[in-house]
A protein has these predicted regions:
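Membrane-integrated ABC transporters
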Residues: 1-35, 55-62, 80-84, 88, ...
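Juxtamembrane helix-loop junctions of ABC transporter transmembrane domains
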Residues: 3, 35-43, 67-112, 116, ...
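An intracellular "coupling" helix at the cytosolic face of ABC transporter transmembrane type-1 domains
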Residues: 12-19, 108-109, 125-134, 138, ...
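Transmembrane helices of ABC transporter permease
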Residues: 16, 20-31, 136-191, 261-277
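Transmembrane helix-loop-helix hairpins at lipid-water interfaces of multipass membrane proteins
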Residues: 21-76, 156-161, 272-278
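Transmembrane helix-loop junction
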Residues: 44, 48, 105, 156, ...
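Hydrophobic alpha-helical segments in the permease module
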Residues: 62-77, 170-172, 244-258, 277-282
Length: 282
């Protein structure tokens, strides 16, 4: 099945807790706007202090707004994360119940097979990864779409060109880079997953055959095998972490270049008389 089909099937499980998810999205959007407008109010304060046109009455008003928005940001962030993790852990409990129900029908015959390491990985690591999906993917994607739309429109209220540059940066960081990273890292992720399953299977075989290992004095060879599996798993994990680090570095670089590009376009528009100094500053 395609990743989109799997994601759609996982999203369906959220339906009973849809009100909580919607609340998390609303709080996330408001919270991100609060965080963004903290710096914008700082810009308004500078405009007011310099005697330039500003939507605020005075510098004191700007600082009061900054304080209120900072407090709101903290409260809303906490509430958003609490809602997302409540949904995630409730659904993880539901999924684990379904998995263990299926295992009860399969055991003990299924655990005698060579793929029992896959089952252990499924019960532990794989299900834990769903916490990232439910707590840090569904609502953040919705929040990102709404915030990108809002900030692009806000920037366009000063001039359309910096808004288009900003939108291009959003699309690069939010869509193009994740798709590229996922395609490049797919092989490494699958290799790590297989190495983890192989290690689990080897450890289970060692535990189940511990009496025979001791009887035939095969402990040294078995220990070397465990070490070899652990080293292989470590190498696969290292490759995966390298790709994660590379993605983070590229993300930060794109964000920096986007900021510089927006500033450069705004300065050029200011020189041409198409944008005021307040637009450049904000």
């Amino acid at each position: 099945r395609s990743p989109f089909a799997i994601a759609a099937q996982l999203i369906v499980l959220v339906r009973p807790m849809l009100p909580i998810m919607l609340a998390a999205i609303v709080m996330g959007v408001i919270g991100h706007f609060c965080a963004t407008f903290i710096t914008i109010f700082g810009g308004f304060a500078l405009l007011t202090a310099a005697g330039l046109p500003s939507p605020l009455a005075g510098v004191g008003t700007a600082f009061a707004c900054i304080l209120v928005f900072a407090l709101l940001r903290g409260v809303l962030r906490y509430a958003e994360q609490a809602s997302n993790h409540y949904i995630a852990f409730k659904l993880l409990a539901l999924i684990r119940d379904k998995v263990f129900g299926a295992l009860r029908r399969l055991t003990p015959a299924k655990l005698e097979g060579r793929d029992r390491g896959d089952l252990i990985s499924l019960i532990t690591a794989d299900i834990e990864q769903l916490e990232v999906f439910y707590a840090h993917t569904i609502s953040p994607v919705c929040i990102a779409i709404l915030c990108v739309t809002g900030m692009t429109c806000f920037t366009a209220s000063y001039h359309i060109l910096p808004a288009l540059v900003l939108l291009a940066g959003y699309l690069l960081v939010g869509i193009a880079l994740p798709v590229w990273s996922a395609r490049r890292g797919d092989k490494a992720a699958r290799e790590y997953r297989q190495a983890l399953a192989d290690t689990n299977s080897y450890l289970l075989e060692s535990l189940r055959g511990l009496r025979d290992i001791l009887q035939y004095q095969n402990t040294a060879a078995r220990a070397e095998g465990i070490t070899a599996h652990s080293e292989t798993l470590g190498e696969k994990q290292k490759a995966l972490k390298y790709r994660e680090g590379l993605t983070v570095a590229i993300t930060n670089t794109l964000i920096l270049f986007t900021v510089i590009a927006v500033l450069g376009v705004s300065l050029q528009l200011y020189r041409n008389g198409q944008m005021g100094v307040e637009g450049v500053l904000i």
